[in-house]
Amino acid sequence: MQGRAIWAEGPIHSFDLPSSSLERGGQALKSGASKTHAYMDEEVGTSTAEAWTWIVPSLSFIQGFMAGQAVLLMLFLGLFRYFFMTSSPGTRAQQQADLLQRVHAVRTSMDMRSHVPPYARVPYEQGVQACVQDLLSQVRYDPSEHAPESLDWLNVLVAQLLMSYRMSILNAGMCAGRNEDMDEPALPSTANAEKTAAKLALERVLNEAMQGRATKHFLDRLVVTDIDMGCRYPTFSHARVRPALHAKSTLVEIDFEYMDALTLGIDTRMWLHFPQWRFGSLAANLCMRVERFAGTLVLEIGTLPEPTPVQARVCLHPNFVLDAHLSTILGSKSKLQDVPKIEELFLARLRSWLEHNVVWPHFWHIPLPGIGTSPADPLA
């Protein structure tokens, strides 16, 4: 039979195959390989189609969900627009009627929820005097029968305020002392850390204030030689309410007394610029001590007869007491000490300043925060 090999013990004999048989065998191999590739391509295509069948439904679900949410939102907006909003404001009468209806509904709801008894007061249109009388009646204060009150609580608050100011001056002086060289002789103002700090703070304030004045060319640098901020506190008592003179408000009168040893000593030089610049200088050392300051303080809150912002006005009765002393030394070579006329002129000038600024009928005006005033208003 052709195409078979016969194995024997002897030598191997081969038979030659015809060429047509070889060609048919090669074509069979090629057709098998092509079928194998086609089968593999069919398997790959099937897996890809299955993957897309999983992706496409997920995208369709998200799109449908978003479309549903958009429809619900548009439906909600349409219902809200139809029930709660209007396209045109309507006539003025209709607007006022709607406003009254809303206000009445809110007021009725508030009255039903709250249990506060109704209060009544005198309308402001009846005048300030009627309002003041109504004010006194509501706070149950009769000026003609009410006894003067003690102000122990106010004494505590003022004492705490004064203590805070003293401590702030001490802290400011300590901060300034870190940057300044204390190469000065031992002065009463440097006896302890508290006085040293107060000296530095006060010197800085006084010398900065002198820079913008015309006297800076005639006065040398100011040196604080002695300072004592005191250790006691003022006391207030016998507060009573009185009607104001212009009958537009009430005022409060408070007696006060402050007994301490407030001391301030300053050393400087006064320059003479004639006939030439800095022709000569006159050394001057002044020390003032306030031992007692007492009187009656008047506090009034309200508006003046003319239209002005709301403010507090403070003044002193003319019978105030100011016990102070001044010691002076003038000159470098020959010295003039404690000239009585200088002390008299200085204390008279101090009392005159008080009388023209804080003694009745002059007031110290303290602007209070206003309503409806612009921020640029200096009194606001």
From Swiss-Prot:
UniProt GO BP: mitochondrial genome maintenance; mitochondrion-endoplasmic reticulum membrane tethering; phospholipid transport; protein insertion into mitochondrial outer membrane
Cytoplasmic membrane side: 86-380
Membrane topology: Single-pass type I membrane protein
Lumenal side: 1-64
Subcellular localization: Endoplasmic reticulum membrane
GO cellular component: endoplasmic reticulum membrane; ERMES complex
Chain segments annotated as transmembrane: 65-85
Domain SMP-LTD as annotated: residue spans: 147-369
Keywords (A to Z) from UniProt: Endoplasmic reticulum, Lipid transport, Lipid-binding, Membrane, Transmembrane, Transmembrane helix, Transport
PROSITE patterns in the cross-refs: SMP
InterPro entries cross-referenced by the UniProt entry: Mmm1, MMM1_dom, SMP_LBD
Principal place of residence: endoplasmic reticulum
Domain of life: Eukaryota
Any one GO molecular-function label of the UniProt entry: lipid binding
Domains (record comment): The SMP-LTD domain is a barrel-like domain that can bind various types of glycerophospholipids in its interior and mediate their transfer between two adjacent bilayers.
Function: Component of the ERMES/MDM complex, which serves as a molecular tether to connect the endoplasmic reticulum (ER) and mitochondria. Components of this complex are involved in the control of mitochondrial shape and protein biogenesis, and function in nonvesicular lipid trafficking between the ER and mitochondria. The MDM12-MMM1 subcomplex functions in the major beta-barrel assembly pathway that is responsible for biogenesis of all outer membrane beta-barrel proteins, and acts in a late step after the SAM complex.
Subunit (UniProt): Homodimer. Component of the ER-mitochondria encounter structure (ERMES) or MDM complex, composed of MMM1, MDM10, MDM12 and MDM34. A MMM1 homodimer associates with one molecule of MDM12 on each side in a pairwise head-to-tail manner, and the SMP-LTD domains of MMM1 and MDM12 generate a continuous hydrophobic tunnel for phospholipid trafficking.
Family the entry assigns: Belongs to the MMM1 family.
Protein name: Maintenance of mitochondrial morphology protein 1
Organism: Malassezia globosa (strain ATCC MYA-4612 / CBS 7966)
Gene (name only): MMM1
